[in-house]
Amino acid sequence: DGKVGEKEKVEEVREYVKSIKGFKSIHYTFSKNNKGLADSIIGGVSQVINQYGKVIVLEDDLVLMPNFLNFLNQGLDYYENNQKVMSVCGHSCKVKVPADYPYDAYFFTRSSSWGWATWKDRWDLVDWKLNDWDSVVANRKAFIKSQGSDVFKMLRDCKLGKNHSWA
């Protein structure tokens, strides 16, 4: 699922993926056609989450701490019944955390595509078509304060068909 003219590189990555060891089991799905970023991620996450009820998603170029998967799995278990928590993330924007903050986690209004996990019931709430866009625009200042101006611009571009991001 790469760019036109990169068939050899795509095959190299597929062979590498097939060689990965260290997990109880590995399932991979290779696409015959380039679906684009948004459709690939949304479709892949939906496939896994529909089968298992939850999912952990990683970017392909991350370097993880040894306890990363344990952290996300604990978060999935701990917050599973808290409908206010949409996802558990292993990365966030830079925030000021007090030096004496005693916990391993904190709440934040933004999500991150760089290592995260969620549950099927939360995933099913996402409005991929941005049907509520008029409400977002009407409450623009509050949205930007909560999510950031970059997210507002990205969603606006998605709504206008200029961007096909999923995050």
Where are these regions (language model features)?
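An acidic/histidine-cluster motif and surrounding catalytic segment
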Residues: D1-V57, L62-A167
